[in-house]
Structures are given as C-alpha cells and as structure tokens.
C-alpha cells in the first residue's frame, strides 16, 4: 500500500513541477542530485526543457544516473564517473574568497579537525585520547565540533595546544583552511575539494559504511597523496597517532594557484554551455 501511495505522490510532484516550471518561465533545469530533484527533471523532460547535470561524488547517485539519460550536458567533479561527462571539478562557494592580509604566520604545524555530525563522536574521542601524547609536539589543533558535539568542548579545552569552535561561518572556515597545514576530516566531496584547494594534507576518516566517502577518499589517495584511515579498524588510533607523528614538522607548500579563478572556472564552463 505504501508503495502505491508513494507512486501517486511522485506523480503529483511531477505535475507540481510542471506547473512551477511554466508559471515562472524556467528555461533550463540544473540538477545536482537528491531525491527531490527527480520530479523536476522528469517535468523538464516532458516540457522539452534542457537539463544539465553535475555529479560531485566518485560514484553517481541514482537520481543523477537517471537525470543524465535526459541531460543535454553532464558534468562531474572526477573522471570516469558518468558516460559522456565533462570533468569540471567541484562547484564551490564564492564565499571562500576573502582577504588574507590579517592572517598570522605560524611556525607550528596547524591541524584542523572537522567531524561535524553526530557520527563524529568516535573521531573526536580518538583525538582526545591521543592529545596527551601530542601536547609536547609542535602541533596546534583547531577543533570544529558542530552543534551536536558541544559536550566535548570542555574536554578539548584542557589542552594548551587546542582551540575549540562550535561552529564556523563559510568565511571563517576559509580563514582556517588558509592557516591550517593538515586536515583530519570526513570524506564528503565538498569538504575534500575545499581543503585540497587550500593545499592541506588530508587525513581522511570516512563515515563508516558510506561507500561513497570511501570511494572519494581513495581518489584523493591516488591523485593527491592523501591518507585514508578506517575508524572501525582495531588499530585506528595507533595508525592515526603514527601518521600525525610522521607529520610533526609538516608545513604545507602553498601553490601559486588563483583560488578565485579555480572556484569560478567550473561555473564559467557550465554557463558557457548553457548560453552558447
């Protein structure tokens, strides 16, 4: 019964999408994926409107696999993801570009720890256990907890080489990327692309049982010399400590890339195809 109801809801969503596409005179539909995008894509197909698809992940999700069959142009953030796709890299926020004059140079190795979600407790707890062994090293940690892990704030603040933040705006995060040398991070495509843009050494700890994050991380191991760790491994903490100690004197080499151009170029390519 539920499947029948879902089918009727889906048909209603398609008709609603047709209504809004006509009402607002939409000429082009751009799809980034997600379940709610599929009715809009199918409505656009029925109305004969051009569809453009961008897939961020190394493994395309179902909606984008379907949408790509109707698309006029297909774009990806990685190679060998979808047939006939143009690789344009990731689509990142323009807010990542801000003034850097105020940033202070540091002789320490700056490590940015980002877990964000409720699934990050294992990652944060592992770092807390390792911090006593790392406090005497030349490390400075910036820990972004996210709103779901604020109970750990006081634990992190007991260490002199740790700065704790509950939340960061996009511009604040950009400044932290600029200052940091290493990121201990999950393996979502947007986060990895942002951190790679700022030349951070990536220690990637994918959310367990998320095959897309493991696939994303493997690409960065192959192409960017990243480090991939499995938090479900029994020796996860020992491996993480060993990797950090190897990098205790690491300072990133900032390339001469124009960050603003790197962010704008994929968008310019897509816009050129749309109006060309």
Predicted regions and their residues:
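C-terminal "capping" alpha-helix adjacent to the active site of nucleotide-linked donor transferases
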Residues: 222-251
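C-terminal alpha-helical cap of glycosyltransferases
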Residues: 242-249, 260-276
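Acidic donor-binding loop of glycosyltransferase active sites
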Residues: 26-28, 178-191, 200
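Donor-nucleotide binding loops and adjacent catalytic segments primarily
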Residues: 105-182, 192, 214, 218, ...
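Structural loop-to-beta junction motif characteristic of Rossmann-like glycosyltransferase folds
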Residues: 49-50, 181-182, 199-207, 225
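Active-site-proximal region of nucleotide-activated glycan assembly enzymes
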Residues: 46-99, 103
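An amphipathic, basic-hydrophobic alpha-helix
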Residues: 2-28, 46
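Short His-centered aromatic/hydrophobic patch
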Residues: 32-36
């Amino acid at each position: 019964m539920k499947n029948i109801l879902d089918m009727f809801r889906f048909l209603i969503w398609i008709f609603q999408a047709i209504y809004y596409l006509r009402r607002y005179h939409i000429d082009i539909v751009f799809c980034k994926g997600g379940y709610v995008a599929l009715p809009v894509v199918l409505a656009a197909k029925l109305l004969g409107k051009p569809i453009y698809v961008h897939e961020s992940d190394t493994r395309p999700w179902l909606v984008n696999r379907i949408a790509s069959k109707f698309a006029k142009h297909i774009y990806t953030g990685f190679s060998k993801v979808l047939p006939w796709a143009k690789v344009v890299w990731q689509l990142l926020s323009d807010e990542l570009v801000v003034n850097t004059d105020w940033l202070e140079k540091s002789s320490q190795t700056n490590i940015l720890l980002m877990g964000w979600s409720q699934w990050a407790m294992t990652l944060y707890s592992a770092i807390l256990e390792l911090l006593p062994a790392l406090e005497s090293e030349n490390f400075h940690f910036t820990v972004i907890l996210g709103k779901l892990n604020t109970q750990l704030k006081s634990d992190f603040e007991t260490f002199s080489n740790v700065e704790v933040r509950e939340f960061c705006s996009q511009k604040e995060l950009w400044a932290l990327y600029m200052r940091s040398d290493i990121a201990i991070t999950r393996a979502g495509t947007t986060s990895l692309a942002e951190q790679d843009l700022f030349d951070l050494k990536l220690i990637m700890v994918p959310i367990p049982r998320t095959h897309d994050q493991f696939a994303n991380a493997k690409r960065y191991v192959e192409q960017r010399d990243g480090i991939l760790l499995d938090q479900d491994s029994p020796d996860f903490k020992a491996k993480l400590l060993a990797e950090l100690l190897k990098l205790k004197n690491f300072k990133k080499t900032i390339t001469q890339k124009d960050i603003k151009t790197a962010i704008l170029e994929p968008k310019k390519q897509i816009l050129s195809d749309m109006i060309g």
